[in-house]
Amino acid sequence: LYSSKILLSSSSAKKDIRKISKTAYKKSFLSKFVFKCPEKKDISNIAILKKKYKFNTPYFYLPNQYWVHKNHEVVLKALKYIKHKFSLKKILIISSGSNEDHRNPDYIQKIKHYISKNNLKDCYHYIGVIPYKDVLSLMYHSIALINPSKFEGRSSTVEQAKSMGKKIILSNIPVHKEQKPRYSKYFEVGNFKKLAHILMSENNVNQNGINLNYNDILRKNNEDLLNYYKSYIKLISE
């Protein structure tokens, strides 16, 4: 409350802060961050990743931390639905991120129990906390990124994937729509059947995961970064 300005990363967050404090709302301004797209030389070869993380098929990537609102359950329910309704074939989801949440310390055990109970170990591969370079590399080589969250201030994984021209499968929460990924498909937060059909469709359509010429992606990302820097400097200088 003593600051002259409060920087927020989304209009959705600004609407939320309005409910909490009118004083804070009046001092809040939008600064929608942009991620720098990695150079190709900084992306690990897929063969290295396959050996390191023990997989050998195309995959979707889910890099969310294991917090309840990140909504991993809907992804597992989608896989269970595919397995029992359509005979699960060649769909793999690789998931990384911290599994510690002091608010819900038993959450990761519930997730592991669900995976074991429903025989999903062959299609859901949790690899824990990994180096940032590997996060970007797995994102680069994936069929698509998945973010099923129930809530976000502004999703950094979505912005990372956007910077790389990736396909993104998203829950239809307001901030995800606000982020406007160029290549995106949405499903309702709890609609595992819709998510299942999206996964099956994308698994069949796109096995390499790269949507554009990477030089074009880098050029567009540089433009986006420059525009962000200019807007940020203007905002803090006024």
Question: Predicted segments — roles?
Answer:
Residues 1-238:
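Carbohydrate transferase catalytic cores enriched for Leloir-type hexosyltransferases
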